[in-house]
Amino acid sequence: AKIQQTATFNQGFMTTELVAASILDMNWHDLTSVEGIDVNTFEKEQMAKIGLIEEIIPRYRTTYFNHIFNSGYSAGYYSYLWAEVLDKDAFDLFKEKGIFDPETAKAFRKNILEKGGSDDPMKLYKQFRGAEPNPEAMIKGRGL
């Protein structure tokens, strides 16, 4: 039991810093021009807008947030959280129907695995799950 409890230790902090980094990423990529912008001031203003307290800083500060500037993650850092939402919500269906329920497994295979990127992801997910992903599953999984 104690080992299982460690899985949700400090998740409030970790979730907050991940959300803050995701918002910062989106805000940088929402700009039409960066000319004349002071990086530290911009970051501080963005974190103040969401009410982030000084004790919780974003996972990565702008000056070393390589994910959002040097890779395919531009304006997509949030995808870590979104993937977790999908994971937890999909698994909840398996738990509801039975982990080894053949119909649930078949629906997952036919609507998610077989289709890949061939259609709108939300459409495919809804065909599998019967509804849009529910973030509550992730929140519960994090012990929040």
Where are these regions (language model features)?
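Cation-handling catalytic/transport regions enriched in His/Asp/Glu
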Residues: 1-144
